[in-house]
A protein has these predicted regions:
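Non-heme di-metal
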Residues: 2-288
Length: 288
């Protein structure tokens, strides 16, 4: 496979059946990421959005399964679906814990919201839905690369199981970052739609994140009692390593002829595959 001028070997995403220790006996502080109310609500919101979002990604790819003729791409799609399914399963287990702690994230995974998502998917074309998935996969790949490559982020204190979940999820997002994109191209998806969809998503990103985060914090009585702390932590989050320069990295997708594998994350993948799943990997004990 060739991405731009870079030759990339065919990689098959591996479905790892991981189960993290999110049992009822595991105790967390209220603000489980660095005792930071804003960052904790942000991570909780992301975790709440992942399971239904990834199910939508799977649906968008599956609808084209009978039009995928390349056996390598078929195998990559199977790995993509397996990985996304496992992500949803483990995030739901974490979400149950977070909801019990008072985080209001259950609405996004409710039956009512599922019906609305399915109605929306029926209103748009399958190709537009797939273009949305390809664009969203670039989002997650950009965030994943930051999480795994920046020492500033890895140094943030937090619960070990939560960090293991995030690192595992990030690793696998990089492993399958180009699958939906390649399906989109293989079934005739064009550049105009691809770029327009991403431009719209970029425009909506910060307003949507800011709004949902504000609503989440507004429902937190403890956070409401400390508004100056919330403002300080919000400035640190949006001015910090996760968001700094984010729009520029997302905008690479808008270049005509762009391919996700133009961004070389091979060395980062090898490093984290070894750190998490090597002989003494941090997650070996969680693999079933």
């Amino acid at each position: 496979m060739t991405a731009g001028s870079r030759s990339v070997p065919v990689r098959y995403p591996k479905t790892r059946r991981v189960r993290f220790p999110f049992g009822t006996d595991r105790q967390y502080g209220k603000y489980f990421v660095n005792d930071d109310s804003v960052f904790s609500h942000f991570v909780a919101g992301l975790s709440g959005a992942f399971p239904p979002g990834e199910e939508a990604f799977i649906r968008s790819v599956r609808v084209f399964s009978d039009r995928i003729t390349d056996p390598d791409l078929k195998k990559r799609v199977a790995g993509f679906i397996g990985q996304e399914s496992m992500h949803g399963q483990e995030h739901r287990r974490l979400n149950d814990k977070l909801i019990a702690m008072g985080y209001r994230i259950g609405w996004g995974d409710s039956k009512a919201m599922e019906r609305r998502r399915l109605r929306f998917e029926q209103l748009i074309s399958p190709l537009a839905h797939l273009a949305m998935t390809a664009a969203a996969e670039h989002y997650t790949a950009v965030l994943a690369e930051r999480v795994l490559s920046l020492d500033e982020i890895q140094a943030i204190p937090g619960d070990d199981a939560v960090w293991h979940l995030l690192n595992w999820h990030a690793l696998e997002e990089l492993e399958h970052k180009s699958v939906a994109f390649d399906v989109y191209r293989s079934v005739g998806g064009g550049e105009t739609t691809r770029i327009a969809v991403m431009a719209a998503l970029i425009a909506l990103t910060l307003p949507l994140v800011a709004t949902t985060l504000t609503l989440s914090l507004a429902g937190d009585r403890q956070a409401r009692r400390h508004p100056l702390r919330v403002v300080r932590e919000a400035r640190a989050l949006f001015g910090g390593p996760l968001f700094r320069g984010l729009m520029g990295d997302l905008a690479k997708y808008l270049r005509p002829g762009f391919h996700p594998d133009d961004i070389d994350t091979d060395a980062l993948l090898r490093r984290w595959q070894q750190e998490l799943f090597g002989a003494e990997g941090a997650l070996v004990e969680y693999v079933r």
